């Protein structure tokens, strides 16, 4: 079998990536740091059916994206270019983005702390019996970890932050974690960005619930309404408030000047004779009281009627009445 040349491999890669872009409209950009070939193979098997994982050098991926954009006129795909930084891969999918992202996360595997590795998380060693004999205390002393000898073994007294996130793992830390059998890190494909029909967004968006989306939408409408009212720019949300404010302003002008309109006449009347406020309030109170009185009277009539019916009943059937 003739081995393909470097140029032929590039052409084949360009063809494959362009075909995938034509077929799929959703792409997950994933970081692949410290991911082994076996682990990557398992991820491919797990996503088989509606997703395809494609790895490659950034320069090759960028070139293929540009070629596809030039040949197809699809300029939206160029939004991928700024995302192709570092050790990344592409997952083309037709499935639900959240479900695919969750499936990818299942394939993280534990890994030991190797010397020189940048810690992705804080590493804290919890207190407890280590199972190591007293001759191993030198490891703990170098790292200033308080210990005591308990039943012939070394016991850590308090929790110790051994490595901070972002720090490089030293030889002493790596040796101690190996002796304790601790694999503090886990590695796998990590979704960094999401491309969907030309739009690019953070993977955190996939975790938003419907309630959170509604809340954010309502908050956005409130902000737009406030801005529209502040600059007197009519929008659908601000229009009712603008009409009410305009009516109040017109009413204030009518009260302060001789200009008038039907709705302002009643206000002017009340302002000229404030006692009419009392009359109006009394009328409202009387209406409410009258309704209560009528209800009370009706209840009393009904009560008397029931008493009368009871008397008739007792008069007609008094079998034990004395003569």
From Swiss-Prot:
* Annotated InterPro entries: Ribosomal_protein_uL10, Ribosomal_uL10, Ribosomal_uL10-like_insert, Ribosomal_uL10-like_insert_sf, Ribosomal_uL10-like_sf, uL10_eukaryotes
Q: Which UniProt keywords apply?
A: Phosphoprotein, Ribonucleoprotein, Ribosomal protein
Q: Which residues, renumbered to this chain, carry the PTM Phosphoserine?
A: 308
Bias (Acidic residues) occurs at 308-323
The residues the entry assigns to the signal sequence are none
Coiled coil ranges: none
| Disulfide bridge map | none
One Gene Ontology term of the biological-process aspect is: ribosome biogenesis
Any one cellular component term from GO for this entry? cytosol
The UniProt entry, under CDD domains, shows: Ribosomal_P0_L10e
Q: What Gene Ontology molecular-function terms does this entry list? A: mRNA binding; structural constituent of ribosome
State the function annotated in the UniProt record: Ribosomal protein P0 is the functional equivalent of E.coli protein L10.
What is said about its interaction partners and assembly? P0 forms a pentameric complex by interaction with dimers of P1 and P2.
Query: Would you tell me the protein name for this molecule?
Result: Large ribosomal subunit protein uL10x
